């Protein structure tokens, strides 16, 4: 257990550095579900209906992700929130959108059908820790560009021992003073769960345009040096209870991204129904191939 925590937290400290400015909201509203294997098609169909309703009637927006490495059939839906007040406002807007699109009774049935697709679900409200994040975008446009161009996300949940939160944060800030001087570092987002979990949990998340972006990252020894690395290992044993790492890929077909993110890569975030178009084209071609001129028809 300790060894696993040590190696997962290697990622945490190596990725933490200063923040330029708040780019998009102070909170992340996160909904995580595990879908029954036999219900995947129903789950996707219902989600796409919710997407259509929220688009047409100005409801909520979100980014959907699917597990690549981690527990199977797990999906995460993440929305930005400015504050608690906006959570209420957006929830009301999403409910109103569903009622307008489907009617109250049909909307409630769809919600029951959706829940029947799930093995379990969990909601978390996470506060962005800009003071612990590294190389975050300087403004909303840069943030939208980073998210819009990303295709995979690695996130590590770090569970801190009771009474050691201050020590944990202090060490991260100390380590980042060294880590931020390293030239080969990428943006990293740190958040802390404030609603919906036991104990104290931090999430450290990194984005890449492909899995290859995780190759050839600097090691902890490269960043901290031998003495700093030893200090890190000691702190990790004393302050960290457990860690869990998950790798997700973005799911554009289940997302309803904010327009500023979608227009960065419209072909990805708003995929065209190419399968339906291709099927129609093949059917037409097949019909044409199967038809013969009257003169060529065999005589009866």
Predicted regions and their residues:
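Bacterial N-terminal signal peptides
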Residues: 7-18
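Short S/T/G/P-rich N-terminal loop/turn motif that feeds into the first structured element of a domain
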Residues: 22-230, 235-300
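Sequence-pattern detector for short linear motifs
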Residues: 6-7, 295
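N-terminal secretory signal peptides that target proteins for export/translocation
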Residues: 1-4
């Amino acid at each position: 257990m300790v060894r696993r925590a040590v190696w997962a937290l290697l990622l945490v400290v190596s990725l933490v550095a200063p923040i330029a400015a708040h780019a998009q909201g102070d909170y992340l509203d996160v909904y995580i579900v595990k879908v029954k294997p036999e219900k995947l098609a129903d789950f996707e169909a219902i989600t796409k209906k919710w997407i259509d309703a929220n688009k047409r009637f100005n409801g909520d927006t979100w980014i959907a992700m699917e597990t690549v490495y981690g527990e199977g059939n797990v999906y995460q839906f993440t929305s930005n929130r400015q504050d608690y007040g906006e959570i209420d406002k957006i929830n009301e807007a999403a409910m109103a959108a569903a009622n307008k699109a489907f009617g109250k009774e049909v909307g409630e049935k769809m919600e029951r059908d959706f829940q029947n697709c799930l093995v379990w679900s969990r909601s978390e409200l996470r506060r962005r820790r800009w003071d612990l994040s590294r190389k975050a975008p300087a403004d909303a446009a840069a943030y939208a560009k980073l998210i819009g161009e990303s295709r995979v996300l690695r996130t590590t949940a770090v569970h801190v021992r009771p009474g050691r939160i201050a020590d944990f944060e202090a060490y991260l800030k100390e380590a980042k003073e060294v880590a931020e001087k390293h030239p080969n570092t990428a943006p990293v987002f740190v958040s802390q769960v404030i609603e919906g979990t036991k104990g104290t949990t931090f999430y450290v998340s990194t984005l890449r345009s492909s899995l290859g972006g995780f190759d050839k990252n600097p090691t902890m020894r490269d960043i901290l040096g031998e003495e700093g690395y030893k200090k890190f290992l000691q702190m990790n044993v004393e302050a960290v209870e457990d860690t869990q790492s998950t790798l997700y890929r973005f799911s554009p077909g289940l997302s309803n991204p904010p327009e500023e993110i979608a227009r960065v890569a419209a072909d990805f975030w708003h995929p065209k129904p190419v399968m339906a178009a291709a099927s129609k084209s093949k059917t037409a071609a097949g019909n044409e191939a199967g038809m013969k001129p009257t003169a060529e028809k065999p005589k009866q």
